[in-house]
Amino acid sequence: MMSTYFSAPLSLPTASVPAFIALAGPEESAREGLSGEAQLGLDKVFEADGALSGQAQMLLAPIRKDSTPLTQFAVSPRYASSGVRRQCSFIAPGQSTILSSLKEPETTQVYLAETHDVPQIVAEFSTFPSLKNRFDGPKRVPIEFIDAANSGDALTAHDILLEELQKSKKRSSFTRLVREKNWEYAVWTSWMRSPQGYHVHRSYTVLSVPWAAYLVSARTLPESYLTQPSNAPNLAHASGPAGDLEKCTRTELWAKLAPFVVP
């Protein structure tokens, strides 16, 4: 049984989360670069004298230690509210920091978790286990679908995907499940921190229905809690033409993701 919370989570405006992560930098420069708006969103992490609160210091410690965080993004018409979920894991020995927005996109919960629980937290982020491996989906999806999904527009992405699938006369469980809005588009991204900021190391994009999962060849990434320099490549290790799908069993997928969650 997981013992996730060490203390009550810190609730922050999602827009202020990148600024909170930046506070893990050198103390003398951590607050200098924050805009007035970001500082307003982070008022609860500072004491009256301007020092970081004890809770903030505990949450920032794993962020400071982990130079290869993992971000997760998922969009599905099945999700409540905006249809979008976001999560970021900074994995360190003993305790890790999780930043998570699963229900209300404008708010992010930041909490400490036992590091040995992180693989389960990462796995439970996605609601589609894809146990049956019944592969009868298309060979590719429109780039417009990828763009809509990456922007968090679940309804537009759904319409584009369904329209494309309905062009085929072939019956498939994949098309039926998509028609029922039983699909999920998820992106797992491993980052590397450098003095210039965070850079994408490796990313996997997956389109899944309850019966099957497919790796998506994508050239773009959704917005996340981490940003990389504007002159850096947008995505590393993409394979095949954009939009191509590759069958992927649950075992194969977790073999690819396992290195992301090993501290």
What are these regions (language model features)?
Residues M1-P263:
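Short, surface-exposed polybasic-aromatic patches that bind anionic ligands, especially phosphate groups
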